[in-house]
């Protein structure tokens, strides 16, 4: 046993210090990034935000809606090959280039993903997702996926430390997914005591990944557009959003009605709700590490997408970054004890 005494920070612990700017308008800010990925060699341009690969976020409808904003969607792994075929038949190449195919690490997952990728060559992204990316089995699966799909861009996680980030990149991942426990419907930290404050995880993993020519996506912990800006400021190449995109018409959650008001169910992928839906219940040897919440219906996701992108542009103007690419270079974080004036929050 040992204790690390370095202070680790989450998004709520900091604000971004404003700096002199020559920008005249938020409209002057370019949010589109252009990337060429280390292993796949593929190039991609777009807004580097990803809708999370959750049942109640990463849907085909979400992918179609967010593609118009140049935003990616990691489509969850529970759609059948036939459902994928129907989606592909009704989608343009522009939509498909904004789609990630999500998979687990079982043999069945591998075979299913292979079938999906064979449906259309425009599917260039694979998202290999497990709760704990520290297992040897996971690293071996990433290497297997890289060998099988040498020209596909592979995103893999989740991890929170630099050395594991490096191992995944060396094993074939182009993008490493960073985050254990920060999600809005994740209870891993309270069920297991395991986790890492998200901003520090992003800063440390970005440093490790960029040293090898890899990239990271900050997954979890964002509750506001300001948090998205902080993640990019901390060095994230991409930011993945779950709760901020839940509860919309495109989210795919079950709708329930209480006292005449409609709500949408949103749950973590290790929650009892998810395990009952996909594997028949919680296995006797494990505990659920997610929760289910009821969200008031929020309408079309386009309004939320505009709000997030608008906040991000504004953050860039406050620090003088004319492009999103410049945000991390222009960011100075200050530690704080408060984020906002909350006097009217309960009204």
From Swiss-Prot:
Keyword flag Membrane: no
Record EC number: 1.7.1.7
Superkingdom of origin organism: Bacteria
PROSITE patterns found in the cross-reference section: IMP_DH_GMP_RED
GO annotation (BP), single: purine nucleotide metabolic process
Reaction catalysis annotation: IMP + NH4(+) + NADP(+) = GMP + NADPH + 2 H(+)
Entry annotation: catalytic residues: 186
Residue sites binding K(+) per the record: 181, 183
InterPro entries for the chain: Aldolase_TIM, GMP_reductase, GMPR, IMP_DH/GMP_Rdtase_CS, IMP_DH_GMPRt
Binding-site positions, NADP(+): 108-131, 216-239
Entry's Gene Ontology molecular function annotations: GMP reductase activity; metal ion binding
Function summary: Catalyzes the irreversible NADPH-dependent deamination of GMP to IMP. It functions in the conversion of nucleobase, nucleoside and nucleotide derivatives of G to A nucleotides, and in maintaining the intracellular balance of A and G nucleotides.
Subunit and interaction comment: Homotetramer.
Protein name: GMP reductase
Gene: guaC
């Amino acid at each position: 046993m040992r204790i690390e005494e370095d202070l680790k920070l989450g998004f709520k612990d900091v604000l971004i210090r404003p700096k002199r700017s020559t920008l005249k308008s938020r409209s002057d800010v370019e949010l589109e990034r252009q990337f060429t990925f280390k292993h796949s060699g593929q190039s991609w341009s777009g807004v580097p935000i990803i809708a999370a690969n959750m049942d109640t976020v990463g849907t085909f409808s979400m992918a179609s809606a967010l593609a118009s904003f140049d935003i990616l969607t990691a489509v969850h792994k529970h759609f059948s090959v036939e459902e994928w075929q129907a989606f592909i038949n009704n989608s343009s190449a522009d939509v498909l280039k904004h789609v990630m195919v999500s998979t687990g690490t079982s043999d069945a997952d591998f075979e299913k993903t292979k079938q999906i990728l064979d449906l259309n060559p425009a599917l260039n992204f694979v998202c290999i997702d497990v709760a704990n990316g520290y297992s040897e089995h996971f690293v071996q699966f990433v290497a297997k996926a890289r060998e099988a799909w040498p020209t596909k861009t592979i995103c893999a996680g989740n991890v929170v430390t630099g050395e594991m980030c490096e191992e995944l990149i060396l094993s074939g991942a182009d993008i490493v997914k960073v985050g254990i426990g920060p999600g809005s419907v994740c209870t891993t930290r309270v069920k297991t005591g395991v986790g890492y404050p998200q901003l520090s995880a992003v800063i440390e993993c970005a440093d490790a990944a960029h040293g090898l020519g890899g990239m990271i996506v900050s997954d979890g912990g964002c509750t506001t557009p300001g948090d998205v800006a902080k993640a990019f400021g901390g060095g994230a190449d991409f930011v993945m959003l779950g709760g901020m995109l839940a509860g919309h018409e495109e989210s795919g959650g079950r709708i329930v009605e209480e006292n005449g008001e409609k709500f949408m169910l949103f749950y973590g992928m290790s929650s009892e709700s998810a395990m009952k839906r996909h594997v028949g219940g919680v296995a006797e040897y494990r505990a659920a590490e997610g929760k289910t919440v009821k969200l008031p219906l929020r309408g079309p996701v386009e309004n939320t997408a505009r709000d997030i992108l608008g906040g991000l542009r504004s953050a860039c103007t406050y620090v003088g970054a004319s492009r999103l690419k410049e945000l991390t270079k222009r960011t100075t974080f200050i530690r704080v004890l408060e984020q906002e004036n909350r006097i009217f929050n309960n009204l």
